[in-house]
From Swiss-Prot:
Its main location: cytoplasm. GO terms for biological process: rRNA base methylation; tRNA methylation. It comes from Streptococcus pneumoniae (strain P1031). This is Probable dual-specificity RNA methyltransferase RlmN. Binds 1 [4Fe-4S] cluster. The cluster is coordinated with 3 cysteines and an exchangeable S-adenosyl-L-methionine. One of its GO terms (molecular function) is metal ion binding. S-adenosyl-L-methionine binds at G163, E164, S195, S218, L219, H220, N296. SUPFAM superfamilies: Radical SAM enzymes. It comes from the Bacteria. [4Fe-4S] cluster binds at C111, C115, C118. Specifically methylates position 2 of adenine 2503 in 23S rRNA and position 2 of adenine 37 in tRNAs.
Amino acid sequence: MKPSIHSLTHQTMQEWVLEQGEKKFRADQIWEWLYRKRVQSFEEMTNLSKDLIAKLNDQFVVNPLKQGIVQESADGTVKYLFELPDGMLIETVLMCQHYGLSVCVTTQVGCNIGCTFCASGLIKKQRDLNNGEIVAQIMLVQKYFDERGQDERISHIVVMGIGEPFDNYNNVLNFFRTINDDKGMAIGARHITVSISGLAHKIRDFADEGVQVNLAVSLHAPNNELRSSIMKINRAFPIEKLFAAIEYYIETTNRRVTFEYIMLNEVNDGVEQALELAELLKNIKKSSYVNLIPYNPVSEHDQYSRSPKERVLAFYDTLKKKGGNCVVRQEHGTDIDAACGQLLFNTMKRDRQKAVAAVNP
């Protein structure tokens, strides 16, 4: 199975070109064809020799993904199901924001973090995506606009799809390098956000990288007892260890951290939890921001329901009065399989049902 050419960073593409006995500038030409002109085959790279094109075809594919289901929401959100070369499935989401076009990418097939409210956790981790498979999600969504002759470009990326990005650390870092490269898609690092669940040692590593990508942490509870009950990762990385790493990140990078807090009715959305959260954040108040997220119900997690508006507003008001920076996140795609992992899980469930029906007609 040949890898995608998108698996190469600009640097490793230069190294590959030199290994083929070509001049280094050929890497820039290939890079421009891929990310500026966004061709779909090596044959379209008309300023390359036939010999180099043959080597590219022999060793790489351009696009490693096949497009499957596409769901479009009334609010402009588009959810894609892509098939990987080994037949496994992933999902990607396009969101039309007031500030531009934002794409949410997946980094793993399935997820082992096991958050008890999340559809992604219903799909056990099968493998990591390589850099090329993550980059290809962006390129295929951009193709959606290119083919329509629309002069629109993806401007923002959120790494919040299925999987824990820092459990696939090196591939995710190479994805950032590729998509941020100023000779390619040139999506600014500050327009990219990576959302993680709390691998504290990786937060420290990320701080030392000097990458300008925004960091978001899935917190969802203000104390260890509650967080451990809904996020099993907290048993390995309790809040004390997590916040020590976050404080190191803030001190090292001088950058703000966003905390994601999903609102689960009568679980974590009370005024008492808002007060606990304010206390937890008091030492990093000026360097933190809280995203209050309305819950998209998942039928397999029917122990949870969406917080009523009045409870969300009471939580928000309490946090604001204590000096917290927070916002209630705008919803997208509520009329489709909107929750992370929901489209993929529902597709897999339907496929299983069809298989059972075929065996037991």
